């Protein structure tokens, strides 16, 4: 067995021992030893391998798999620009704290700076965006040192896993694992009985790292009129379940007192408990920045949770005293009902179909056990405004840096992970539904994510709903959408594209239909085999008018 083959097999074996069950592989020559080792592991049922030709979509597929499974996922590629194409996914994984392992092959380091083909200084390329940049030295053709090299390689792989999962830091995130490989890059003919240098007995990792606990209790008096703001990455806090809570769609639903974000300006809370990292609603940002309202920030990680500079204290969990006033709870419940009614009434009265109408229809069609993946622009905001009840529903969205890139691939990865978990614990004949709601720009931006080869795992029940208003609808609601700029904003912010969504899907052999918004519910209830796209035409020119009408109705 040649040195590169041996090293690759050891690394793959140790990754599996450390909990990796899915790997995304992009083709290349330099990473051939890793590719052969991964294919062997896939054939033996130890991992599920997903082959993609585009590293950009591969990175987001890995993110979807990781957030769907709650486990580390590797994406493997060759050297050069293949590594650079992981940049956006690495940044998202950093801020969303996703255990993404970038497993890159490299040329031998002595070739750096010599003009060697497809060679660049890729170790350290991701800088501060990764939890660690770890390299293995070149494998040596030294049979007498096999045991020592095996220990070194396995220990380094365990270090990668610990950094990615946050086992020693409580801060999961991306890791760059760079492996220089020397030719030969393909396996040699092997003598009978050739074996990979062994790991620990019973399939255990070489170096076990128990997860660290991160516990900072914070005393909070609940007799003061309090609202909870629950954002992305929020933990579950049962002792706060009785409080009125503005929960973003990706936040866990832990109480029976939801509070619509548009109800906040109608209330005068005396303090705020912030969970996770809120990213969506302007009324929330205004409240958190109010110097007259103390903010207590509870997070699950080490990042500083205070955008406005107004937090009075930070911790990880609340130690509560007192109880909320019944009159305060009643007032919040009434304002919540009022805000939901205002949105629904204005949606019914509005003469045109908008993205908010599409989001409301999707929200109404969901049922317990579904998984919902939301685009990072208007869709995630719209389902919140539509009053989505997330009980029994898993909601995913790339909120780390909230880019629209990679959303199709993220949805595919999340669907594959969710279905895989269901197959292991439930009935494999009835896969759970994953529904993705995204805008047309988000869809077009990552349309190459639809490319899944005929030999690759494909979701069994994924519906991608494309709310198509032919451009960037969110800008209609921002300063750029002010009528003063109407002569230029449509082109430079709205970016109309006139893409034929159906033709694009046909090019990738993906089923698609264009339907009306009132057909969404019945169509989603129809069982779909595999992956399909439902396109709903929407209008963005009246979005500003609709939102103004909702605000006036409040």
From Swiss-Prot:
- The molecule here is called 2-succinyl-5-enolpyruvyl-6-hydroxy-3-cyclohexene-1-carboxylate synthase
Entry note: cofactor: Binds 1 thiamine pyrophosphate per subunit.
Source species, domain of life: Bacteria
Organism (species): Mycobacterium tuberculosis (strain ATCC 25618 / H37Rv)
Q: What class of enzyme is it?
A: transferase
Keywords assigned by UniProt, alphabetized: Magnesium, Manganese, Menaquinone biosynthesis, Metal-binding, Thiamine pyrophosphate, Transferase
Entries under Pfam families matching the protein: TPP_enzyme_N (PF02776)
Q: Give the record's pathway.
A: Quinol/quinone metabolism; 1,4-dihydroxy-2-naphthoate biosynthesis; 1,4-dihydroxy-2-naphthoate from chorismate: step 2/7; Quinol/quinone metabolism; menaquinone biosynthesis
EC number(s) from the headed UniProt entry: 2.2.1.9
Miscellaneous note, as given in the UniProt record, is: Was identified as a high-confidence drug target.
- Has the keyword Manganese been applied to this entry? yes
Q: What does this protein do?
A: Catalyzes the thiamine diphosphate-dependent decarboxylation of 2-oxoglutarate and the subsequent addition of the resulting succinic semialdehyde-thiamine pyrophosphate anion to isochorismate to yield 2-succinyl-5-enolpyruvyl-6-hydroxy-3-cyclohexene-1-carboxylate (SEPHCHC).
Question: Which GO terms are recorded in the biological process aspect for this UniProt protein?
Answer: menaquinone biosynthetic process
How would you summarize the oligomeric state and partners of this protein? Homodimer.
**Lineage of origin:** Bacteria, Bacillati, Actinomycetota, Actinomycetes, Mycobacteriales
Task: Identify which cofactors the protein needs according to its UniProt entry.
Answer: Mg(2+); Mn(2+); thiamine diphosphate
Family to which this protein belongs: Belongs to the TPP enzyme family. MenD subfamily.
Enzymatic reactions: isochorismate + 2-oxoglutarate + H(+) = 5-enolpyruvoyl-6-hydroxy-2-succinyl-cyclohex-3-ene-1-carboxylate + CO2
Recorded GO MF terms: 2-succinyl-5-enolpyruvyl-6-hydroxy-3-cyclohexene-1-carboxylic-acid synthase activity; magnesium ion binding; manganese ion binding; thiamine pyrophosphate binding
Q: Which SUPFAM superfamilies match?
A: Thiamin diphosphate-binding fold (THDP-binding)
Encoding gene (name): menD
- Mind telling me which Gene3D superfamilies this protein's record contains? 3.40.50.970, TPP-binding domain
Where does it sit, as one GO cellular component term? plasma membrane
Against HAMAP family, the record matches this protein to:
MenD
């Amino acid at each position: 067995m040649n040195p590169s083959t041996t090293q690759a097999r050891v690394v793959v074996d140790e990754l599996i021992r450390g909990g990796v069950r899915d790997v995304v592989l992009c083709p290349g020559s330099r990473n051939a030893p890793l590719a052969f080792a991964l294919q062997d592991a896939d054939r033996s049922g130890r991992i599920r391998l997903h082959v993609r030709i585009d590293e950009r979509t591969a990175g987001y597929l890995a993110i979807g798999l990781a957030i769907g499974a709650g486990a580390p996922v590797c994406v493997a590629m060759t050297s050069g620009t293949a590594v650079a194409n992981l940049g956006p996914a690495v940044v998202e994984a950093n801020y969303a704290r996703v255990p993404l392992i970038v497993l890159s092959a490299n040329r031998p380091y002595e070739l750096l700076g010599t003009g060697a083909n497809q060679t660049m200084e890729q170790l350290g390329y991701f800088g501060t965006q990764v939890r660690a940049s770890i390299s293995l030295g070149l494998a040596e053709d030294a049979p007498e040192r096999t045991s020592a090299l095996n220990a070194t390689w396995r220990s380094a792989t365990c270090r990668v896993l610990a950094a990615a999962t946050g086992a020693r830091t409580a801060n999961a995130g991306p890791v760059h694992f760079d492996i220089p490989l020397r030719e030969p890059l393909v396996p040699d003919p092997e003598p009978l009985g050739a074996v990979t240098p062994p790991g620990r007995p019973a399939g255990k990792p070489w170096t076990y790292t128990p997860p660290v606990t991160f516990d900072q209790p914070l005393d909070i008096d609940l007799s003061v009129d309090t609202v909870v703001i629950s954002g992305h990455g929020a933990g579950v806090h049962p002792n706060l379940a009785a409080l009125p809570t503005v929960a973003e769609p990706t936040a866990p639903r832990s109480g029976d007192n939801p509070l619509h974000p548009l109800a906040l300006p109608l209330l005068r809370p005396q303090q705020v408990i912030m969970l996770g990292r809120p990213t969506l609603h302007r009324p929330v940002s205004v409240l958190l920045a109010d110097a007259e309202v103390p903010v207590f920030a509870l997070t699950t990680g080490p990042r500083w949770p205070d955008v406005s500079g107004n937090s009075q204290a930070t911790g990880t969990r609340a130690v509560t005293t007192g109880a909320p006033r019944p009159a305060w709870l009643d007032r919040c419940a009434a304002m919540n009902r009022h805000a939901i009614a205002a949105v629904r009434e204005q949606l019914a009265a509005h003469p045109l179909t908008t993205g908010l109408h599409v989001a409301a229809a999707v929200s109404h069609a969901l049922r317990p056990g579904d998984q919902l993946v939301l685009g990072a622009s208007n869709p995630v905001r719209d389902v919140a405004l539509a009053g989505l009840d997330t009980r029994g529903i898993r909601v995913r969205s790339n909120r780390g840096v909230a880019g629209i890139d990679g959303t199709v691939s993220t949805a595919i990865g999340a669907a594959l992970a969710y279905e895989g978990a269901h197959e292991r614990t439930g009935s494999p004949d009835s896969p759970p539904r994953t529904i993705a709601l995204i805008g047309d720009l988000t869809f077009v931006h990552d349309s190459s994510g639809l490319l899944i080869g005929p030999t690759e795992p494909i979701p069994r029940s994924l519906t991608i709903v494309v709310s198509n208003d032919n451009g960037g609808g969110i800008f209609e609601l921002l300063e750029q959408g002010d009528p003063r700029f109407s002569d230029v904003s449509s082109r430079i912010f709205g970016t109309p594209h006139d893409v034929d969504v159906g033709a694009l899907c046909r090019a990738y052999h993906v089923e698609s239909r264009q339907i009306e918004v009132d057909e969404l519910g019945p169509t989603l209830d129809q069982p779909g085999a595999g992956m399909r796209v439902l396109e709903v035409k929407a209008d963005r020119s009246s979005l500003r008018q609709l939102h103004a009408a909702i605000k006036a109705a409040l």
